[in-house]
Structures are given as C-alpha cells and as structure tokens.
Amino acid sequence: MKLNEIADNEGSRKKRTRVGRGIGSGKGKQSGRGGKGQTARSGVRIKGFEGGQMPLHRRLPKRGFNNIFRVELSEVNLDRLQDAIDAKKLDASATINAEALVKSGVLRRAKGGVRLLGRGELKSKVAIEVHGATKSAIEAVEKAGGSVKILAPKKDEGEAKAS
C-alpha cells in the first residue's frame, strides 16, 4: 500500500445534489420544494406540523400540572460530605447545615433547603441539620455515631413578608 494509492470507500462521499440547474437535471424550476407559498421559502418549518395528520402533541392526553408551591431541595450524598471533611473543608466537630455546605463549596446554593442522600460511606461522627434525608442516610450517620436533625421546610421570602 502506498500513500498515493489510498482512496475512500465507494459511496462514502456522496455527491451533493445541485438544485435549480435546469429542467434536464431533474431538480430544476422548483428544486423539489413543490409549488409556491410559505413552505417553498427558505428557513420555514412549522413546528409540530405533520402534513395535516393530527400531530403527536395533540394525539396524546394532557397530564399533570406544575405545582407553584413545589420546593426544590439541593441534594448531597454522604460520600461528598466525607470527601469535604477529609479535605478539611468541613469541620466534623461543628454542626453541618445548609449554610456550612454552601460556604465549604459542597453545594453551590441551598435555596429550598438540603436533602441528605445515602450514597457512599460516612466515617466521621457528625451532627447534621437538613430539611430532608433518606432512611439509609440517617442510618449511616447514626451508625457512625452522629445525628441527623430534620428541619421544617424553608419559607419563601414572599410568604414571610405576607404574614
């Protein structure tokens, strides 16, 4: 095999169809776009239109709703906590709460509160204050000799002003 003998596989580089180049090309005049009108112009795609067939988003039933009172909790796993303690970002002797987690960089923000999840292993004895925790997370913390305190959900600033 020589460098000047290397060639592409047959059909790997397909020739581009040049449209609008005369009636003899088979793609002249309307260039395969049908007649005139909106769809013959460039940059036109009617979102969700399926050629008159009932579109999928109308064939399927409506379902659910968006709860405006939904509280999104930031999630943190036990292994992330242990890594932060090992790296001396978190003080295991002090109470670990949302503020401490944000300050140490474990979480970026804890707007609605913090939920503790049970992935990983916790070796340090810690006191944790969170807004939610899984059973496995609570068991793992208590097994390591620590404690978990579940706080009441955070109130919105708007709700606090109203009352």
Curated annotation (Swiss-Prot):
Residues 1-43 are annotated as: Disordered. Residues 21-37 have a biased composition (Gly residues). Pfam families: Ribosomal_L27A. InterPro entries: Ribosomal_uL15, Ribosomal_uL15/eL18, Ribosomal_uL15/eL18_sf, Ribosomal_uL15_bac-type, Ribosomal_uL15_CS. Keywords: Ribonucleoprotein, Ribosomal protein, RNA-binding, rRNA-binding. GO terms for molecular function: rRNA binding; structural constituent of ribosome. GO terms for cellular component: cytosolic large ribosomal subunit. PROSITE patterns: RIBOSOMAL_L15. One of its GO terms (biological process) is translation. Binds to the 23S rRNA. Belongs to the universal ribosomal protein uL15 family. Part of the 50S ribosomal subunit. This is Large ribosomal subunit protein uL15. The gene is rplO.
